[in-house]
Amino acid sequence: MGKKKVKDRSAGTDSSSETAGPSCTHIRKGTENSVLKKACLNEHWSSCQDCEQDKPEEKQILEDQTDGESPAVWMCLKCGHRGCGRSGNQHAIKHYETPRSEPHCLVLSLDVWSVWCYICDDEVQYSSTGQLAQLITNIRKQVLTAPDKRNASKKSWKEDISVMNSAEQTQDEEKGKKGKQKSSSKQEDSPKSHQSAAAGSSAVVSVRGLSNLGNTCFFNAVVQSLSQTQYLRELLKQIAEEKSSFSITPALSSELDPLQIQLERPGSLTLAMCQLMNEIQETKKGVVTPKELFTQVCKKAPRFKGFQQQDSQELLRYLLDGMRAEEAKRVNSGILEALKSSGKNFEAEQTKKIVKEYEKDGAPKNFVDRVFGGAMSSTVMCKECKTVSLVTEMFLDLSLPVADEAYRKKNQKKAVQHRHSVSDDGDQDTSSLANGNEDMPTGTGSKYQQKKAKKQAKKQAKNQRRQQKQGGKVTLDAITNQSSTDPADSSMQTQTVSVNGSADAQPADTNQEDLSLEKHNEDQDDEEPEQEQAASVNNRFTALSEDQTTEDIAEQVNEDEDEIEQNCAEEEELVEELNTMSLTTPSEGDVENGEDTLEDVKEYTVVNRDPELAFRALASRTAPVKQECSVESCLYQFTEVEHLTENNRLMCVTCTKQQPGYKDGCKKAVYRDALKQMLISDPPVVLTLHLKRFQQVAYSVCKVNRHVQFPQILDLAPFCSLNCTGVKEGETQVLYSLYGIVEHSGTMRSGHYTAYVKSRPSTHNCVQNGTAAASGDAEASKGSWFHISDSSVHPVPEAKVQSSQAYLLFYEKIS
């Protein structure tokens, strides 16, 4: 026993002392010397043993996906298994994930001799004298004595150096020979960082993992895509480094004098964003902590506090609108300071008006609008007089509907069943309530959600008991009418539900109420079937218990009323919270906007346009085939011509003026059938597409899991107006290249956000003008795709990217 204790103690000391950085506690259990000695007899070191067993066709596909480069091999320090890391198969991590009695968590890179722990999700730092170092030294001797492996290792090592950032010096014994070539932090195929950049090209943005600060995957996925938005990075860099000043020269018709503006320091949110972008590019660490930026976002929008799961698209809007508001405030303050310096004194109201005029006449566009800002033109034409009117709206992203035929048919079928389940006296069968909630996502929800659902169930049960006890005083019809207009039901009908894409299940609480009530009744009254409960509801209202006196009933009713008032107050608070979660433009107080908002007053202006050209796009468009679900089909549906009829008819100003008696004072409005279409009139530099996967149907909220196909090169011309700005005359293409994807996997209640980003060289034209190419031969920029899940980064082939369940798509303009 004594020897065993000494042995355990020495092993633990060795494992802890050999780590230079944060100690890994899995070294002793993750290594096995005796097994590795036998495994070292195998001479096939340069290949994955699982890939060797694949069929020749699969191996050829794998080679094509990795551009002919041999994938890095990782050796398990427990059993000697050799698995690939760079390929789509990822046999090394699959070997670790296989259930065993002891963890196989430590792997050794046979290219750069670094050790990785899958449990710690970090590289294991070890000294040159510890037990782990001795084990690795023995393995290296075995590997490098094989001539085929030695040559392959040198070749692979040179290739890896050419695709890394300069950061850390490697631990290869040949570093004296290659000392002039500094390696970036870790091997490109490291299970954690996968730095995707060319060493000689500083313009390529590194890909770093981001720490999860507590259910912040929705935030990390968006930041990863923004970090690869090159034009945004350049503008942020200019704002942070340069002292911004500009002059405003009003129009000739204006009475205002030219004004020289000095801008103050950027806002805290903008600076935090700039700081994070620089850290991702320059840090030597494989994982970056975006705490400062997330803190600033929470200050602008407190709804993101509390470690709840949120919606990525909503976060993106708050982030961009917050920086946009800070820039507007900078310009506003600069104009005010310039007016004060000019020595002219104005009254408060007059000063506001002058500032507005300066902002409207000559103030430059802020960097958010320069990158993401676009414009939509909504065209309406009266069918009677053919008058064409137009209104232009600004946008930062486009929310596209995702059609789900299977869900629609299923919902229609349930609606028919729901109508048949209503009884003659107006009472609804409780089984239909259960059926109506089948479309809700699966999962029990968090403890907080379950507790809230139980409170709602208790409230309904108390309401029902109260109605039963008052049955002797109130008629059945009165009770039925009261229940049909119950405040809880009416509030459920008017609540605005946020489409939080992940497990923030508050939108579904209105439906969870019915499910929880059924479960509550089953637990308490198992002996009574649901059908009997529904059938006996009316009978319970008609009789007054003979064992109770009127005074007893009145006393109980008063007690119940107090409890109900308290529950109603809680319910009103819940309704208030749900209403504040609606997806509105963040100008409600969460974001400190200036006077300007993204959505100005929509006022249609009559234009002199040929009715035949009113609804013509920049390029011809073809209707999508049946059952097609792609970005193009979603855009087609979004920009389709609408017929305004019946209750949606247009109040035509021209027809109203042409009616008899109009000049005599008769100004009765005339409504006509009309046509309406929305087209893009000013395509943005960076096009952000939001696929609306979270939809509300009646009382249920569902996620559309249908795969939406998206192209690497998107031609936006069929969805742009004929008089589109920013397009050269005669051009019939507006091309965009995909570089970022935010994916949502899982259900409404239990989901996770990840990102796919394309690390690519920057284009000079993109930095200068916001566009990357000026010819019709534009093609997708060359680069490498990476899948990022918080701190974990893996290179992936394009085929894996195309199969992702996209929620947000980021395209950059290339023509």
UniProtKB/Swiss-Prot annotation:
InterPro entries for the chain: Papain-like_cys_pep_sf (IPR038765), Peptidase_C19 (IPR050164), Peptidase_C19_UCH (IPR001394), UBP16 (IPR030849), USP_CS (IPR018200), USP_dom (IPR028889), Znf_RING/FYVE/PHD (IPR013083), Znf_UBP (IPR001607)
Zinc fingers classed as UBP-type: ranges: 22-143
Annotated segments matching region Disordered: 1-27, 148-200, 411-510
Chief place where the protein resides: nucleus
Annotated catalytic residues: 217, 752
SUPFAM superfamilies, alphabetized: Cysteine proteinases, RING/U-box
KW Cell cycle (keyword) present: yes
One Pfam short name: UCH
Residues where Zn(2+) 1 binds: 24, 26, 117, 120
MF terms in GO: cysteine-type deubiquitinase activity; cysteine-type endopeptidase activity; histone binding; histone H2A deubiquitinase activity; transcription coactivator activity; ubiquitin binding; zinc ion binding
Gene Ontology CC: nucleus
TM annotation in the entry: none
Comp. bias intervals (Basic and acidic residues): 148-161
Annotated compartments: Nucleus
Residues that, per the record, bind Zn(2+) 3: 76, 79, 95, 104
Top-level taxonomic group: Eukaryota
Keywords, sorted A to Z: Activator, Cell cycle, Cell division, Chromatin regulator, Hydrolase, Metal-binding, Mitosis, Nucleus, Protease, Thiol protease, Transcription, Transcription regulation, Ubl conjugation pathway, Zinc, Zinc-finger
Reactions it catalyzes: Thiol-dependent hydrolysis of ester, thioester, amide, peptide and isopeptide bonds formed by the C-terminal Gly of ubiquitin (a 76-residue protein attached to proteins as an intracellular targeting signal)
EC number: 3.4.19.12
Family annotation (PROSITE patterns): USP_1, USP_2, USP_3, ZF_UBP
HAMAP family the record matches: UBP16
Domain remarks in the Swiss-Prot or TrEMBL record: The UBP-type zinc finger binds 3 zinc ions that form a pair of cross-braced ring fingers encapsulated within a third zinc finger in the primary structure. It recognizes the C-terminal tail of free ubiquitin.
Description of how the protein assembles with itself and partners: Homotetramer.
Job description of the protein: Specifically deubiquitinates 'Lys-120' of histone H2A (H2AK119Ub), a specific tag for epigenetic transcriptional repression, thereby acting as a coactivator. Deubiquitination of histone H2A is a prerequisite for subsequent phosphorylation at 'Ser-11' of histone H3 (H3S10ph), and is required for chromosome segregation when cells enter into mitosis. Regulates Hox gene expression via histone H2A deubiquitination. Prefers nucleosomal substrates. Does not deubiquitinate histone H2B.
Protein family membership: Belongs to the peptidase C19 family. USP16 subfamily.
Record protein name field: Ubiquitin carboxyl-terminal hydrolase 16
Origin species: Danio rerio
